[in-house]
Amino acid sequence: MVAKDLPRAAALSARVGWNQVAADWRVFLRDGAVRVVDDGDPDCLAASAAVLPYGRDLAWISMVLVREDRRRQGLATELLRWAVQRLAGTRCVALDATAAGREVYARLGFRDAFGFARWSVPDLPVTGGVRPMRAADWPAVLALDSAAFGAGREALLRDF
């Protein structure tokens, strides 16, 4: 994938009900690698997969998406194989799976480790003791995140 594909990648996310926008896809291009299937649709890519390595010890496979009209044609399997090969030598490769993708991942050797849920809350009022983050806070935030996540991801965090 190249930068000119960003709008069609964002369209793929939207079409399959995910929430990534072009800025999110830019992170994958900058910090990792993205492979897509372009079937000529001028508005939307057919399929995608991305990898985000965090050094040699940890990597995440992301954005394994297939447009509805192109499903059950082996695209997800092909893209997942590319991602796994791209990350060869990485100690731990992980991903999070939707119910639709779980079968594909299981066939390639991935197994369940934990679940997740997406939560949202309305904006809350700021109360005493809470302040915006300052530049001086970064070292402590990065140390805490690295300890909790298991790898450094400064570039990703600074994007938010």
Regions found by a protein language model. Give the residues of each.
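Helix-loop element at the rim of GNAT/NAT acetyltransferase active sites that forms part
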Residues: 3-6, 11-23, 144-155
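Conserved GNAT acetyl-CoA-binding A-motif
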Residues: 59, 80, 86-99
